[in-house]
Amino acid sequence: MKDTVMVYLLENSIKFNGKPNPKAVMGKILGGNPDLRNRVNELNEVISKVLKEIEVMSLEEQQIKLNEIAPEGLVQKTERKRKEIELKNAKDKVVMRFAPNPSGPLHIGHARASVLNDFFAKKYNGKLILRLEDTDAKRVLPEAYEMIEEDLKWLGIKVDEVIIQSERLEIYYGYGRKLIEMSYAYVCDCNPEEFKELREKGIPCKCRETTPETNLKLWEKMLAGELDNVAVRLKTDIGHKNPSIRDFPIFRIEKTPHPKNGTKYHVYPLMNLSVTIDDHLMGMTHVLRGKDHIINTEKQEYIYKYFGWESPEYIHYGILKIEGPVLSTSKMHTGILSGEYSGWDDARLGTLRALKKRGIKPEALYKLMVEIGIKQADVKFAWENLNAANKEIIDKDAKRFFFVDSPKKVIITGFKNKKINLRMHPDRSDFGNRELLFDGEIYVSDDLEAGKMYRLMELFNIVVEKIENGVIYAHYDSDDISVARTNKANIIHWIPIKDSVKVTVIDENAEKIEGFAEKDFLITEEDDFVQFERFGFVRIDEKLDDGYICYYTHK
C-alpha cells in the first residue's frame, strides 16, 4: 500500500509544483483501487506518513524518487464517462424559457435554470426565450433588466428572444376577460382573512356565484382604477385537499408605480396566470422548474383545461442547497445600500458577478450545472467540484510565484548573495523562468522560533538565533536538504525584501490579506490568473502605482 500511496502523492505533488493535496490523492487512490474502500482509516495513516517524507523533498528529489519507484511513468488519470442528460418527450425544435424576476443580478441558483434551459435548447436544436417576470412592481430593480442579460452573456448563453411581462398587460387582460365571460373567474371583494377562513373550511365565498355580467362590470371598474382591495379569483375545486389551490387569485390591484409603466396600470396578473398565458402563446414545449413549483403546476393546469390548451412537458428538479454566500436578493440590496457590501460583486455574495470577480470561469460553472442536471433528489452544491472544474481551466495558464502574507522580516548572516531560477510553470517551458536574488534580508510568512532550523524553499537551511523587535535574526547552516530532513525542518517560502512587490489579496469573506510577491510578478496584467505557491490561485483585479489588488479564487 505504501508504494501505491507514494506514487500517487508524488504525481500530485510534482503536478502542483511540490505541494501535494492529500484529499485529492485519497479520492484518486480509492477511484483506481476499489478494494481499498474498506481500509480507509489505514489508508489515511499511510498517506499521513508518506506525506511527511515527501514534504521535506525538493521538487527535483520528488521527480527522482518517482522515476525510481514508477519508471513506467506517472499514474494515468481516469474519468468516469457521464451519461448525457436527456429531456423527456423531446423532439427537434424544443422551446425553452428562462424566466427570472428582475429584482437583482443573477446568482448561483439562477445559473442552474439558465444553464439547463440553454443546454437543452442547443441539444435539441431549439429556441431559448428570456422572459423577465416583472409584474410585481415592489420586487423590481430597474437596473436588473440589463444586468440579467449581461450575466447570461458572461455564462455563454445566447437567448433567441427577450420578453418583458410588464409590456404584455393588455394580453393578460384579454384572457382574464375571457375567463370571466366563461364563468371560470370572478371578482372578489371579500376581506382576505375572512376568505382564508372560508377557504380552509372548503366553503365558497359570497362572490363566487356572481354572474359573469356583473363580474365584467366590476372588472372594467378595476381596470379604470375605481376599485380597491379586490382580486380576480379562478374557480377551481373548492373542496380540493390543498387549500391553497382553492379559488386562487389571478389578478390583483397594485397602486405601486412600476419602473416601466409608472401609474398607467392598476391591475396586474399574478404569476400563475401570466406564466400560463405566456407559456402557451410562446409555444413552450418543456418547462424546467424546481419541485417547489409542483403546486403551481397544478394550479396552472386549471387554466390550460379551461382554454382547451395542451400543457407543456413539466420537469421538476430537486432543490439545490447552497451553503456559504448570501443569495437573498433583498438582503444583498439592503447590504449594498447600507455600505455593508461593496456592490453586487462583493466576494461574500453568491451572484455571478461575485464569482467572476473572484476568478470563477463561466465554463466551469456551466459544466457543473449540467452535471447536477435535472434529478428529482435535492442536491448540495459542492464548492470543491466547482473549484476543481475551474482549476482545470485556469491551471495551465497560471504562472507560479512566491507570496508571503503577514510578512516578517528575517536577517540572515553567513552566506553571500545568490540568484536562483525557478520555472514560471512546471508544465510550460514557454513561460520561461523567474529569478529570485538572495541578499541576506527576506520576508517570510511563518512564525519562526529561536533555536530551530528551517529550510528556505529552493535555497538552503537556516537556524534562527533570536527575535528582537519583530525582526528575526538567523544564520546560514547548510545546503543539504538531508540535513533539514534529519532536523525535521519546515520548508518555508521567502521573498527578497529589496525586490518585493506589494500585494493585497481579498478573500471569500472580503477580508484583506496583505503581503508581498516576488519581483517578476510585475510582468502580470489585470485579469490574469496566477498561483501563489502554497497559498492558492488568485485573479489579478487591479494594478496600482504602489501594488496590486487580487481576489482569492481557490486552492
Swiss-Prot record:
Molecular-function annotations in GO: ATP binding; glutamate-tRNA ligase activity
Disulfide bonds: none
One Pfam family, short name: tRNA-synt_1c_C
Transmembrane region(s): none
Reactions it catalyzes: tRNA(Glu) + L-glutamate + ATP = L-glutamyl-tRNA(Glu) + AMP + diphosphate
EC number: 6.1.1.17
Record keywords, A-Z: Aminoacyl-tRNA synthetase, ATP-binding, Cytoplasm, Ligase, Nucleotide-binding, Protein biosynthesis
Database matches in InterPro entries: aa-tRNA-synth_I_CS (IPR001412), Gln/Glu-tRNA_Ligase (IPR050132), Glu-tRNA-synth_arc/euk (IPR004526), Glu/Gln-tRNA-synth (IPR000924), Glu/Gln-tRNA-synth_Ib_cat-dom (IPR020058), Glu/Gln-tRNA-synth_Ib_codon-bd (IPR020059), Rbsml_bL25/Gln-tRNA_synth_N (IPR020056), Ribosomal_bL25/Gln-tRNA_synth (IPR011035)
Residue window of motif 'HIGH' region: 100-110
PROSITE patterns in the cross-refs: AA_TRNA_LIGASE_I
Subcellular localization, as worded in the UniProt entry: Cytoplasm
BP GO terms, sorted: amide biosynthetic process; glutamyl-tRNA aminoacylation
GO cellular component terms attached to this protein's record: cytosol; protein-containing complex
PANTHER family: GLUTAMATE--TRNA LIGASE, GLUTAMINE-TRNA LIGASE
Family assignment from sequence similarity: Belongs to the class-I aminoacyl-tRNA synthetase family. Glutamate--tRNA ligase type 2 subfamily.
Role of this protein: Catalyzes the attachment of glutamate to tRNA(Glu) in a two-step reaction: glutamate is first activated by ATP to form Glu-AMP and then transferred to the acceptor end of tRNA(Glu).
Name of the featured protein: Glutamate--tRNA ligase
Native organism: Methanococcus vannielii (strain ATCC 35089 / DSM 1224 / JCM 13029 / OCM 148 / SB)
Originating gene: gltX
